[in-house]
Swiss-Prot record:
Region annotation Disordered: where it falls in the sequence: 135-155
Gene Ontology biological process terms from the UniProt entry: translation
Oligomeric and partner information: Part of the 50S ribosomal subunit. Forms a cluster with proteins L14 and L19.
GO CC terms, sorted: cytosolic large ribosomal subunit
GO molecular function, one term: rRNA binding
PANTHER family, per the entry: 50S RIBOSOMAL PROTEIN L3, LARGE RIBOSOMAL SUBUNIT PROTEIN UL3C
Functional description taken from the UniProt entry: One of the primary rRNA binding proteins, it binds directly near the 3'-end of the 23S rRNA, where it nucleates assembly of the 50S subunit.
Organism whose genome encodes this protein: Synechocystis sp. (strain ATCC 27184 / PCC 6803 / Kazusa)
NCBIfam families registered for this protein in UniProt: L3_bact
InterPro entries: Ribosomal_uL3 (IPR000597), Ribosomal_uL3_bac/org-type (IPR019927), Ribosomal_uL3_CS (IPR019926), Transl_B-barrel_sf (IPR009000)
Official protein name in the record: Large ribosomal subunit protein uL3
Amino acid sequence: MSIGILGTKLGMTQIFDQESGISIPVTVVQAGPCPVTQVKTQDTDGYNAIQVGFLPVKEKALSKPELGHLKKSNTDPMRHLKEYRLTDAPNLQPGDAVTADIFQAGDLVDVAGQSMGRGFAGYQKRHNFRRGNMTHGSKNHRLPGSTGAGTTPGRVYPGKRMAGQYGASQVTVRRLTVVRVDAERNLLIIKGALPGKPGTLLNITPAKTVGRG
């Protein structure tokens, strides 16, 4: 894994392609700055990695072990910590900052975050089931239909798609394009929609090659 960055989703807007004039939906992300809170090497920990922090908070918001850990790197109290494994020994030191300029326009990234929670949702909203007839005497409008056979197997199979909690789960959107980088304000402009609502914590990493194209 390469070095990534933590950020928060600010919202969506659109920009226009200068050549074709086509509007491009984009999401604005406040990416970093993320101070390096720990450096791990093959000699000391058995693998190479760096740990970064994000979102400064007051000391009273953290426990004493967390404060002691951050004090070793002389960094301010941070709400979130994230570790990124590296193939080679890191060239960063505790206290250095990871900023948005680690990415460039045109880079492909994977973005992970918690999706918006939709509460207890039914079959149509959660699984895109077709509804029944609304007229002609039908009383089956939004019912699930059959959930299994009779005496055999005499039970509902595990994994049967039914109503339940929808959303509020960890989601990764892969191979999104970085359209623009604002290094001064640590902003990433990423093409497309990202998980969660404004304020959601996002983990942005260089894209892993999955499939073709």
